Regions:
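Residue-level preference for the first positions of well-ordered beta-strands
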Residues: 2-6, 29, 68-72
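Short His-Asn-centered micro-motif
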Residues: 7-9, 32-33, 73-76
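Conserved substrate/cofactor phosphate-moiety recognition/catalytic segment
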Residues: 16-69, 105, 109-110
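Glycine-rich phosphate-binding loop used to anchor ATP phosphates in small-molecule kinases
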Residues: 48-104
Length: 173
């Protein structure tokens, strides 16, 4: 059975480092929205292109699943609904799904524990290699779905809804 590994964690938590280790272990293809922003070896992030980057990552993941390749989805995946397209693909193609945190799984828990400290801990987060500002990391942590350390239940992911879906439902009522 092929395997899909879904990485979880905020920017700078070591997801890509861990994904590269797992790539060797599982002979897997790594897909990430970040790769969409790579231009001639340089990371050129553009927030306006984020939806296109995630669609691109999903398309690449679907192609890998069609070929039966082991695949690693290396995005933040902080909310259950963000993982939903990948879990749906995994089910469609008969993949086993595993969840992994960054190189240091305690990073996310430590970040979550200090959220209440605000400005006092901003300096601690200014060292990630992506240059992601602390306030963005805090916003990612605020979206963290249930069971931050343990693997979420696939059924919870499959019934999860994005903020846009929830807003549309609210308008219909």
């Amino acid at each position: 059975m092929s395997i899909m590994i879904i990485m979880r964690g905020p920017s700078g938590s070591g997801k890509t480092t861990r994904a590269r280790e797992l790539q060797k272990e599982y002979n897997a293809l790594i897909n990430s929205a970040d790769k969409y922003f790579m231009v001639k070896g340089e990371y050129c992030f553009n927030a306006d292109q984020l939806p296109a980057a995630h669609n691109w990552c999903q398309d690449r993941t679907r192609c890998a699943c069609e070929d039966g390749q082991n695949v690693i989805v290396d995005n933040t995946n902080m909310s259950l609904w963000e993982m939903k397209p990948y879990v749906e693909m995994a089910e469609e193609f008969g993949y086993e799904v595993k969840f992994q945190w960054g190189k240091n799984p305690m990073f996310t828990e430590a970040l979550r524990a200090v959220l209440e400290m605000g400005d006092k801990c901003f300096a601690m987060f200014n060292t990630n290699k992506h240059g992601t500002p602390p306030e963005v990391i805090f916003a990612q942590l605020a979206k963290l779905g249930p069971c931050p350390v343990f693997s979420p239940d696939l059924r919870d992911i499959l019934v999860s809804k994005s903020p846009m879906e929830l807003a549309a439902e609210k308008e219909q009522v």
